[in-house]
Amino acid sequence: MNLNDVIKGPLITEKLDKAREKFRQYSFIVDRKATKHDVARAVETLFKVTVEGVNTNIVRGKIKRVGRSIGKRPNFKKAVVTLKQGDSIELFEGGAA
């Protein structure tokens, strides 16, 4: 799998922000077909960091209603990457600009 196609974007929530500060864990939305090895390789090459571990899970899309019509948001794969002590990703560290 092409490394540029593995990571779709960052996933930033309050809970994941606390995990980043306390445990050096960063979260990404990744391609559903990507394996843990693909995610680790992509993060290491794109951000120049050392990955210690990768946890993945598939988040089921929620059912949403607008009036009478019912729709469903798509499922997506979430990857939580743990980095080596001292490494960080600047994409997550930036403040308000």
UniProtKB/Swiss-Prot annotation:
Q: Which PANTHER family match?
A: 60S RIBOSOMAL PROTEIN L23A
Q: Which domain of life is it from?
A: Bacteria
Asked whether the keyword DNA repair is assigned, the reply is no
Pfam families with a match to the protein in the record: Ribosomal_L23
On assembly, the entry states:
Part of the 50S ribosomal subunit. Contacts protein L29, and trigger factor when it is bound to the ribosome.
List the source organism. Myxococcus xanthus (strain DK1622)
A GO BP annotation: translation
Name the gene that codes for it. rplW
Extract the GO molecular function terms from the UniProt entry. Answer: rRNA binding; structural constituent of ribosome
The UniProt entry, under HAMAP family, shows: Ribosomal_uL23_B
Q: Name one GO cellular component term.
A: ribonucleoprotein complex
**The protein's name in its UniProt record:** Large ribosomal subunit protein uL23
Say what the protein does: One of the early assembly proteins it binds 23S rRNA. One of the proteins that surrounds the polypeptide exit tunnel on the outside of the ribosome. Forms the main docking site for trigger factor binding to the ribosome.
